[in-house]
Amino acid sequence: MIAIIDYGMGNIRSVEQALKYIGAAYIVTSDKEEIFRSDGVILPGVGAFPKAMDILEEKDLVRMLQEIGRSRKPLLGICLGMQLLFEKSEELQDCNGLSLLPGVIRKLKVPYKIPHMGWNELKKEGEIALWNGVEDGSFVYYVHSYYADCPNEIVYGISDYGVKVPGFVAKGNIYGAQFHPEKSGDIGMQMLKNFKGVVETWKSSQLSI
């Protein structure tokens, strides 16, 4: 069972429809017990970083997400949800994040239209489980004005938008997509299927303990 965290700032319906399409068992929830009982977690998000962190604090979800991130349970952040995984953001004000990944969220300063909205090529950097069946140079769908300034060793996908935008990051059980896999057609569905596979593998490992 995958828990989609509903904290009032996510593109919940599109993520829900995508998981339904790939045949994944899921629940939409902000209940800590349900999230803890899940086999994997998706943290979506659209909006401002400081407001999102305030809401997660109000719902007492920050420490729980940090505990999940430090366990081996698969966690996928999407768009703003990915940005929240980092140490802090410069959006509107300096604001601490979940600190599960090293790096800072900074505003895009490029000679192009902001937000970066639409399809862009994703160049793979290294291999991870979520790349199975995903071709290098596939196009994915973005909507964002900020990007992750982070170490190269956690970057597994890059798009060019005047700067090298980390489109996909990963460290251990933690994954983050700056783009929207649920809006990225067959490629996005394949990545979500791969995440589902990672979740199922983790679940099987827990049953054997």
From Swiss-Prot:
Gene3D superfamilies: 3.40.50.880. It comes from Bacillus anthracis (strain CDC 684 / NRRL 3495). IGPS catalyzes the conversion of PRFAR and glutamine to IGP, AICAR and glutamate. The HisH subunit catalyzes the hydrolysis of glutamine to glutamate and ammonia as part of the synthesis of IGP and AICAR. The resulting ammonia molecule is channeled to the active site of HisF. It holds the Pfam family GATase. One of its GO terms (biological process) is L-histidine biosynthetic process. Pathway: Amino-acid biosynthesis; L-histidine biosynthesis; L-histidine from 5-phospho-alpha-D-ribose 1-diphosphate: step 5/9. Residues 1-205 form the Glutamine amidotransferase type-1 domain. One of its GO terms (cellular component) is cytoplasm. PROSITE patterns: GATASE_TYPE_1. This is Imidazole glycerol phosphate synthase subunit HisH. It catalyses: 5-[(5-phospho-1-deoxy-D-ribulos-1-ylimino)methylamino]-1-(5-phospho-beta-D-ribosyl)imidazole-4-carboxamide + L-glutamine = D-erythro-1-(imidazol-4-yl)glycerol 3-phosphate + 5-amino-1-(5-phospho-beta-D-ribosyl)imidazole-4-carboxamide + L-glutamate + H(+); L-glutamine + H2O = L-glutamate + NH4(+). It is found in: Cytoplasm. Its EC number is 4.3.2.10, 3.5.1.2. One of its GO terms (molecular function) is glutaminase activity. Heterodimer of HisH and HisF. Keywords: Amino-acid biosynthesis, Cytoplasm, Glutamine amidotransferase, Histidine biosynthesis, Hydrolase, Lyase. The active site is at 79 (nucleophile), 180, 182. Coiled coil: none annotated. PANTHER family: IMIDAZOLE GLYCEROL PHOSPHATE SYNTHASE SUBUNIT HISH. Disulfide bonds: none annotated. HAMAP family: HisH (MF_00278).
